[in-house]
Amino acid sequence: MYSTVFYTSVHPSTSVLSRKQLPLLISKDFSAELYHSLPCRSLENGHINKVKGVKVKATIAEAPVTPTEKTDSGANGDLKVPQKKLKVLVAGGGIGGLVFALAAKKRGFDVLVFERDLSAIRGEGQYRGPIQIQSNALAALEAIDLDVAEDIMNAGCITGQRINGLVDGISGNWYCKFDTFTPAVERGLPVTRVISRMTLQQILARAVGEEIIMNESNVVDFEDDGEKVTVVLENGQRFTGDLLVGADGIRSKVRTNLFGPSEATYSGYTCYTGIADFVPADIDTVGYRVFLGHKQYFVSSDVGGGKMQWYAFYNEPAGGADAPNGKKERLLKIFGGWCDNVIDLLVATDEDAILRRDIYDRPPTFSWGRGRVTLLGDSVHAMQPNLGQGGCMAIEDSYQLALELEKACSRSAEFGSPVDIISSLRSYESARKLRVGVIHGLARMAAIMASTYKAYLGVGLGPLSFLTQYRIPHPGRVGGRVFIDLGMPLMLSWVLGGNGDKLEGRIKHCRLSEKANDQLRKWFEDDDALERATDAEWLLLPAGNGSSGLEAIVLSRDEDVPCTVGSISHTNIPGKSIVLPLPQVSEMHARISCKDGAFFVTDLRSEHGTWVTDNEGRRYRTSPNFPTRFHPSDVIEFGSDKAAFRVKAMKFPLKTSERKEEREAVEAA
């Protein structure tokens, strides 16, 4: 069974052609392999560039008539008088408020937005950083305004066509990978992106129009007399409209005036966040990771432009504070011993770019509004950030609310009756409650999983913590992985694609610029293949006692240029000679070589041996004359810990000063 989109325009307009729109057949059994065959990806210096998408869209032959401008004929053939435009008041100019204002404006409504401070995102300004907009929200934006959605997607960094998922915080090993690409392309949805909150807000504000947004206008109260709604600003000004939408955040004044005061729920976690000028070695293959630990976890995401956004969550009571200039130091202590992917980002972030906030949410409620007033976004269902769906749900809310108001106006025009605003608001609320409630619960479950995650037996057991040295996998980790592997595809399919059929008039399409690597499916199934695909420089950084006088060793990826390590130079042997003038190092100690993107060390029957400590803390002596595979974050010792080196994979080679800072930071951690 196929559901096919037909593109039937014989004479497409120049505006359509300028967008490079192409016809595409969408099948329920649409194969990602077919999608992979489309050439679309642009790379420069190994980093993904943003390419304006090629997409499919049906051409509409005539401009739509908004419901408020619609006329009809009475029984005697006389035209009815066009209806007066609805006056919509919006409290809050954050993402949800602006998206709804845009949706309402596109449908011909008279909109007025009140925002306390449009110069910065509420609470954290420019340092709050990027936001992830997933496929479901991008599709809703397309249904609201295709051109604005295009601007947003072009300004964003695509992460959904790379590997994303959960890893163990200490070892860095993959725990579970998320496929957000297949659910999107199979349903003709845009692929997930990350975009700066400030950039997103600026695009939306420009599209809404400065004449619609009243800056420095804080709504503190409202009056609903059944016929109209009047908002009261902090400065005493009053404005009247047909309805009021509260989009004023987790501490919503509109919500408080509707249902009385209530406290937000503390998640149990405080969150540090920052943006680092850093490019991970696997930036081309990995979009974002969630590093799991016991009662702490760490999230990192590529945000484009050579920057990484990170969030560090730590379980502790609310209201804590750090010593002056003490955030970075505390984080290095909390996450000391974690994998390099975490430590690298903390080291690369300036102290004054790190912010701290406690994480709150609000439990789902059955009442979203009353009379001519309703709520959307964080004002009614603030979520924990673990699924990246908080802003996405606000965007979906905005589309649905504007749609219900449009339907009410259409019914009014058809039957010549007053617009039933109250019923349309309740219809919007009913349409959204179940989906929002489920996703809200999933976000909480993700936090619970992070709270209870234990990699090994003994973690969090106090006197029994010595058991961790035996590296026995915790049964909960093993069972949890089975559950996640089975349930995650279904969950992602529903979260990303479950709202697509409600987007009336949106044509399913795929952008060629969102093409994934041909090896994406293999990377999901094979961790080794994913590591081999890493296009980076491999280095050995001095890391042991007494090794501070040693220099970093840059390894060659050329299979014909091995490195020979010894206490004397070996210029007569093909390849690169590395001299370590230490008594524990034999004259010809070991050889390091590269094969198919992987690195191996071979001990050449040295007197004191070659030792490897892997990323899970297991130390072993390599067999003589037998190549032993090593990985980033492993430690290699040539004879003793005085000639110990930590394996690093870097996107760009480090300068000498940076190598010293990296070594000092790792040793301190």
Curated annotation (Swiss-Prot):
Q: Name one GO molecular function term.
A: FAD binding
Read off the SUPFAM superfamilies from this record: FAD/NAD(P)-binding domain, SMAD/FHA domain
The stretch annotated as transit peptide is 1-49
Q: Does this entry carry the keyword Transport?
A: no
Protein task: Converts zeaxanthin into antheraxanthin and subsequently violaxanthin. Involved in the epoxidation of zeaxanthin. Plays an important role in resistance to stresses, seed development and dormancy.
Q: Which UniProt keywords apply?
A: Abscisic acid biosynthesis, Chloroplast, FAD, Flavoprotein, Oxidoreductase, Plastid, Transit peptide
Which positions are annotated as binding FAD?
Answer: 87-115, 365-378
Catalysis: reaction(s): all-trans-zeaxanthin + 4 reduced [2Fe-2S]-[ferredoxin] + 2 O2 + 4 H(+) = all-trans-violaxanthin + 4 oxidized [2Fe-2S]-[ferredoxin] + 2 H2O
Cofactor names from the entry are: FAD
Q: What is its EC number?
A: 1.14.15.21
PROSITE patterns, A to Z = FHA_DOMAIN
* UniProt organism field: Solanum lycopersicum
Which is one Gene Ontology cellular component term of this protein?
chloroplast
**UniProt xrefs under Pfam families:** FAD_binding_3 (PF01494), FHA (PF00498)
Give all residue intervals belonging to the FHA domain.
553-617
Q: In which pathway does it act?
A: Plant hormone biosynthesis; abscisate biosynthesis
| Compartment list | Plastid, Chloroplast
Q: What is this protein called?
A: Zeaxanthin epoxidase, chloroplastic
Give one GO biological process term. Answer: abscisic acid biosynthetic process
